[in-house]
Structure formats: structure tokens, C-alpha cells
Design a protein with these regions (language model features):
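A glycine- and charged-residue-rich anion-binding loop/surface
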Residues: 1-383
Length: 383
């Protein structure tokens, strides 16, 4: 006997009673079947509900041949009437995300004559795929239209059409459908075959915000937040932007220009530092001209700078050159000998200095979790 789906009668039903029809073990969990349930099973891109059933924790819900199975952490007595409580914040979040996705997908598909080819309601965001090259500017335009539609607070319409009625409806669907089809409609925005749970009015979505766009296969993949998720994202973005503004002594709406100016200053300073580094590297190369094998332990610097210093000194010292830059516990290194295979030396060095890295043709680069004393001791014993 198929399970009666109370969530279709009232998606806002948070508590209910049902009779335990069957209870069977599955590993360390139990699969419980009721005569009726308000727990939504995973399907159509929407995750399953969680909650409490007769005191047992419900951690998953899925459907099999019209029967809904509740995965519980303990057994429930067959024949007993049990009380169920939905994890409502989780369910309502899913309803906001799913309804918001319908509204924007209906508008995008109509505007760009495309199909929604993929939908995943994740814990962090909603991922949607479309088989059209929709520009980011167009996505933002639809976002604005969708939010206006949401604020107009349109009612959701649910239909169970006959096969003949269904054939005449301009609805969206990602696959061929058989049996009774459920149609959810936000009039003027979307009509779609859907088995999920939705808000009753568009205003309950709150707002929608696209936060990601990328090329995907023959179209685009969009990342969307709706309702509480969108509000939390915008609130966090405002807090972070305000913090940046305070650091740069500008108003939040001027942070982009201030950061651009700061990056320009940083690039100027980097260029100046690179010039000073180059002069110092040449000085050290001259200082160690003809010195044979040379070890240099330097303050922290970028890996590229370590390599350039090692290269400069190796050209004049007539032997192996090693540069370590950092502090005790963490060094970046470069080793060069233009005329010898340094592979055996590097294997021994990495083993002794807890190093990671390598190279070829007389050059190696990496890092070592050691002290300066250990570096100098190894160098003295192996040079």
C-alpha cells in the first residue's frame, strides 16, 4: 500500500501522527514505514527531511515503489501510532530554495529559450545548469525581475492534470513522465512538473541572489541563494565590506576603488623591492665569487626570490650553492650545482632536514621543517 503524502496536502504541516506499518533493520539503523507521513523523501534535486518520529531520530527519508521509508536510529513498534515532528527550519529552507529556483528558472528559460538541465539543492547553495550561453548581465536582469515577482506575493498553484490536459500545458520538465504528473505553477513566472515541496506564496521566498556563474558544457552553471541563505550571505558580505572600508578609511560603497588604488601601490612597492633584491643578489654573487660551495641562510622571502638568489650566486661561486630562507621550523630552499647531479645530495638533505621538494638538471627547490643549526651541521658534514 502506498504511503499517504501529507506534505502534498499541506507543505507547512510540521507535526503529524501516523501508524507504523512496518519496521525492519538496515545495518545499525531501522527503516520505518507509516500509513501516512509529512516527511519528504529525497527526490527531484531536493534533500530529504529530517526530524523526530516516535522519539526516534529520522536521518534520511526515501521512496521505493510508492512507499516512503524513514531511516531511524531505533526501532518503532509495528501497529502503534507515533507522533512525527519535521525539522522545520531545514524543511522551510528547502522550500525557499526550491521555489526560488523555479521562479528564476522559469524566467531564464523563457527569456533565453533554453532548458534547465540540472538542479542540485545543496547545504550551501543551489546549483542550476542551463543549455544556453546566458551572459552574467542577463542573469542579473532576471534576478531583479524575480525579486520583483517575489515581492508581489503571487500564490502557488498546484495541478494534477489528466494526460489530455497535460499535453496542452506549456510546462517545464527535464525528463519523460509517466503516471500522474504534479504541476507546480507560479503564474506569470513558471510552470513545471515537480515532486518537491514549495512555499504557498512567492513572498515567502523572501529574495533571490545569484552568487556564481561559469561556462558549463553547452551552456552555463549558476549558483543561487534564496530566502534566509541569501539574507545571511548579504549580511556577511556587508559586514566584511564594512570592515574593509574601516581599514581603508572609506565608506562601504567605495571599497572597490580603494582596493584598486591600494593594489596599484602594492605593485609599485613590489617592483621597487624586486629591484633592491636584484641589487643585493648581485652583491652577494660578487662577494662569493670563486668561493666554491656556498650556503646562505636568509630571512623569509618568496620562493622565486630564493631561486633567483641561488641562481645568481651559483654562477660565480664555482661550486654547489644552497639558499635557505625562513625561520626555525620552516624554511624555503633552493640548491644548484650547474655541473653535477645533485639527486643523491637532495635525498640525504630532505631526509636529514625533514624536507620536501626536488628538481632536475642540477637544480632543486622545496621546503624544510628544520632549524638553522641543523642546516649548518648538515652542510658542514656533506660539503
Amino acid at each position: 500500500m502506498e504511503t499517504v503524502r501529507l506534505y502534498y496536502e499541506n507543505a507547512f504541516l510540521r507535526e503529524f501522527d501516523g501508524v507504523v506499518v512496518d519496521c525492519r533493520p538496515q545495518g545499525k539503523k531501522w527503516l520505518v514505514i507509516l500509513d501516512q507521513t509529512a516527511f519528504y523523501p529525497e527526490g527531484g534535486g531536493q534533500p530529504a527531511d529530517h526530524g523526530i518520529l516516535g522519539g526516534a531520530k529520522v536521518t534520511d527519508v526515501h521512496e521505493r515503489d510508492g512507499v516512503i521509508l524513514h531511516t531511524c536510529d531505533r526501532a518503532l513498534p509495528e501497529g502503534e501510532t507515533v507522533h512525527g515532528e519535521i525539522d522545520w527550519p531545514r524543511r522551510f529552507d528547502h522550500m525557499q530554495q526550491h521555489s526560488g529556483e523555479h521562479i528564476v528558472s522559469g524566467m531564464l528559460c523563457a527569456a533565453y529559450n533554453c532548458d534547465n538541465t540540472g538542479f542540485h539543492l545543496g547545504e550551501g547553495s543551489v546549483i542550476i545548469d542551463y543549455n544556453a550561453d546566458i551572459p552574467w548581465e542577463g542573469v542579473l536582469d532576471i534576478e531583479a525581475q524575480a525579486n520583483r515577482y517575489i515581492w508581489e506575493n503571487h500564490s502557488l498553484v498546484t495541478l494534477y492534470p489528466t494526460a489530455g490536459e497535460l499535453a496542452a500545458l506549456p510546462y517545464r520538465s527535464k525528463k519523460e513522465l509517466t503516471g500522474q504528473v504534479r504541476i507546480t505553477q507560479f503564474p506569470g513566472a513558471d510552470m513545471c512538473a515537480c515532486c518537491g515541496t514549495h512555499v504557498s506564496r512567492s513572498g515567502q521566498v523572501g529574495l533571490v541572489k545569484f552568487i556564481g556563474w561559469q561556462k558549463f558544457r553547452d551552456g552555463v552553471r549558476l549558483e543561487l541563494l534564496c530566502g534566509q541563505r541569501a539574507l545571511e550571505y548579504l549580511s556577511l558580505s556587508w559586514q566584511q565590506n564594512s570592515a574593509v572600508g574601516r581599514e581603508l578609511s572609506v565608506k562601504p560603497d567605495k571599497t572597490a576603488q580603494a582596493v584598486e588604488r591600494l593594489l596599484g601601490e602594492v605593485q609599485t612597492l613590489k617592483a621597487r623591492c624586486a629591484g633592491l633584491e636584484e641589487a643585493e643578489f648581485h652583491r652577494l654573487a660578487d662577494e662569493h665569487r670563486g668561493a666554491g660551495s656556498v650556503l646562505l641562510v636568509q630571512p623569509p622571502m618568496e620562493p622565486d626570490s630564493v631561486r633567483r638568489l641561488c641562481d645568481a650566486v651559483s654562477r660565480t661561486c664555482s661550486g654547489r650553492c644552497a639558499v635557505f630562507a625562513g625561520t626555525d621550523g620552516g624554511y624555503k630552499y633552493a640548491v644548484i650545482h650547474p655541473e653535477q647531479d645533485i639527486t643523491p645530495f637532495m635525498k640525504a638533505m630532505n631526509a636529514a632536514l625533514r624536507g620536501r621538494g626536488g628538481g632536475r638538471d642540477g637544480f632543486a627547490q622545496g621546503s624544510a621543517a628544520c632549524t638553522e643549526e641543523e642546516i649548518r651541521r648538515f652542510w658542514a658534514e656533506n660539503t
